[in-house]
Design a protein with these regions (language model features):
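C-terminal functional extensions of proteins
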Residues: 2-157
Length: 157
């Protein structure tokens, strides 16, 4: 299985923070400086582990890279952004939309995480009964249109 990743490199991330920190507008400068302090203090960490680019769902991480899985499991919160990461979180399966997010995470469910996603693929889990049906009445292609988004939290329990 192949994945297309359009996200940033570590260099891009740090360069962007530096540019924002030096911006002429104070509110940009405020956030850039604050974000830089989060990185410097170890509150935020950007990871470039090899597993991120493997053609595997995150539910395989404990088996394939147990040390990295243990590191994420020990983190107070791991934030995932993007449709591809969401697909890898829920194993890119055609879940019933009301399947719990935790169940869809499979063996990755012990990780405390927040998933931020614009819906661009027809896989989703953790919706309340009737939600998908109601949205489908208004927008039949809502799961792939990029016009809808989703924020989901997993407590790791």
């Amino acid at each position: 299985m192949y994945w297309y990743v359009s996200d940033v490199t570590q260099h891009d991330f740090h360069s962007t923070i530096n540019i924002i920190s030096r911006h002429s507008l104070d509110h940009y400068k405020f956030f850039g400086t604050r974000w830089r302090s989060f990185i410097d203090q170890g509150i935020w960490e950007v990871s470039s582990e090899t597993f991120w680019c493997l053609g595997l769902p995150y539910s395989d991480m404990a088996r394939v890279d147990p040390a990295f899985f243990a590191e994420l499991k020990a983190s107070p919160l791991v934030i995932f952004k993007g449709d591809l990461n969401y697909r890898k979180l829920v194993q890119d399966r055609n879940w019933k939309t009301t399947t719990s997010f935790s169940e869809a995470l499979g063996d990755f469910s012990p990780v405390v995480l927040l998933a931020l996603r614009t819906c661009k693929a027809d896989t989703i889990a953790g919706l309340e009964p009737g939600t998908a049906e109601n949205i489908s009445k208004q927008s039949p292609d809502w799961m792939v249109s990029g016009e809808y988004g989703l924020i989901q939290f997993n407590s790791g329990q």
